[in-house]
């Protein structure tokens, strides 16, 4: 039995994006229409729509809002630099592992992946904020880059062997060239889940299908083979065609591509950051607060509800858990929510005000109601994803269903409390 309820109104943004994507079809693939059905609708709406602000442009509130945006831009810069440093560290650790492929080095590489991926998820809110301030052209490119950097779910059998299919995947298909251009062309060529790029392809290569038997991929599968066996010689194999050697090459190519893709997205943001700083004083406080409210709301709706909780309600476990191979979904979701808290509480204006305090001034009930829902949502989500990490031994289907519905209700309430600020801004 599945509990029935209506999807919230924000899902209706889907049609707006399809229309916009039709207009710029040459820059937006059909796959991205499906993958990013909502993200790109906000740029024109939030940056170009006229506002009838109830806040005077010279008011203290407006100057506080400007200060908070400046502070947030600095945080985005710092986070992007941290992600870049973590990715570079991952690449260095990978090089060490390729040189000496043992279990100790593999564990260090997995730890490095977790650090890099968590730092990327911590910056999730920035990407939702950027859609409101980045040009339409750059928005489309950022959406494509996001698909290349962090798409999930992936189809593991498209990458490497899986249970009962020991010869599956690009790693074992010697007809597939592993040069960077071809690997990029293979990414989502037939289906969105047929990924060859990004964090989660690396995740599967590093851990393997450990959800099946609880045993992660051994380091021996990355050990270089420098001599062919008699059977391989008779079959006319070449060293570069062997699974171990292809796996080593594949993970190296993907890592370089990830660094390249994130570097490009950072460049786009750096350019946008400079341009935005020059025109902050053209934004009213109402407009800026709406951008912040929308960024938080859409992160919760798109990343948590639409991509994960709603599919989980239909028992689509394999497609709803972000990091099943490393079993780090609770960490990733916690990082996303921590990113929201940093924006609300840690950034201060010159007068010492936080965005949280500014929101309270527009919605007196916000302080108690928002955080009650937000904190409960975080606890619910961590418990849910922790219980589902080993979904073959998880709770009963009925218990899981009720847990998912509870999380959906809490996250939806959190979004509704933010929406009240939006309403009060117009009063």
Model-derived segments and their meaning:
Residues 12-20:
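Sec-dependent signal peptide recognition
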Residues 38-43:
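Short, low-structural-confidence N-terminal segments
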Residues 46-427:
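Mature extracytoplasmic or organellar-lumen-exposed domains after removal of signal/transit peptides
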Residues 25-27:
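C-terminal motif of bacterial Sec signal peptides marking the signal peptidase cleavage site
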Residues 29-32:
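Bacterial signal peptide processing site
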Residues 1-11:
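N-terminal secretory signal peptides that target proteins for export/translocation
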Residues 9, 21-22, 53:
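Residue-level marker of intrinsically disordered, low-complexity segments enriched
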Residues 34-36, 414:
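Cys/His-rich zinc-coordinating "finger/knuckle" motifs
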């Amino acid at each position: 039995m599945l509990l029935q309820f209506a999807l919230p109104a924000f899902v209706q943004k889907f049609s707006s994006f399809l229309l916009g994507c039709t207009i710029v079809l040459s820059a937006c693939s059909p796959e991205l229409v499906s993958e990013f059905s909502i993200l790109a609708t906000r740029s024109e709406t939030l940056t170009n729509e006229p506002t009838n602000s109830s806040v005077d442009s010279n008011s203290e509130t407006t100057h506080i809002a400007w200060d908070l945006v400046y502070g947030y831009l600095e945080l985005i810069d710092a986070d992007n630099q941290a992600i870049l440093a973590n990715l570079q560290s991952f690449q260095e650790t990978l090089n060490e592992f390729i040189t000496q492929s043992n279990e100790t080095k593999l564990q260090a590489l997995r730890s490095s992946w977790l650090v890099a991926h968590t730092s990327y998820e911590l910056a999730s809110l920035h990407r939702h904020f950027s859609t409101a301030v980045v040009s339409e052209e750059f928005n489309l490119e950022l959406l494509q880059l996001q698909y290349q950097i962090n798409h999930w779910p992936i189809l593991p059998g498209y990458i490497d062997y899986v249970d009962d299919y020991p010869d599956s995947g690009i790693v074992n298909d010697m007809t597939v060239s592993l040069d960077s251009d071809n690997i990029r062309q293979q990414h989502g060529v037939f289906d969105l889940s047929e990924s060859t790029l990004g964090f989660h392809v690396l995740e599967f290569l590093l851990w393997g299908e450990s959800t099946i038997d609880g045993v992660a991929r051994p380091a021996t599968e990355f050990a270089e083979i420098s001599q062919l066996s008699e059977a391989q010689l008779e079959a006319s194999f070449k060293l570069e065609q062997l699974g171990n050697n292809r796996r080593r090459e594949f993970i190296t190519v993907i890592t370089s591509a990830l660094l390249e893709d994130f570097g490009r997205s950072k460049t786009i943001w750096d350019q946008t950051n400079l341009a935005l700083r020059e025109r902050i004083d053209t934004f009213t406080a109402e407009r800026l607060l709406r951008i912040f409210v929308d960024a938080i709301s859409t992160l919760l709706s798109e990343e948590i509800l639409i991509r994960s909780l709603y599919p989980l309600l239909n028992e689509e476990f394999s497609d709803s858990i972000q990091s099943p191979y490393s079993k780090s979904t609770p960490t990733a979701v916690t990082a996303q929510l921590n990113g929201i808290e940093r924006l609300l509480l840690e950034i201060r204006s010159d007068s010492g005000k936080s965005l949280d305090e500014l929101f309270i001034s527009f919605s007196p009930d916000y302080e108690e109601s928002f955080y009650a829902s937000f904190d409960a949502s975080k606890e619910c989500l961590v418990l849910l994803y922790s219980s589902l990490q080993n979904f073959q031994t998880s709770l009963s289907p009925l218990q899981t269903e009720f847990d998912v519905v509870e999380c959906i209700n809490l996250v939806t309430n959190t979004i509704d409390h933010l929406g009240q600020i939006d309403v009060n801004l117009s009063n």
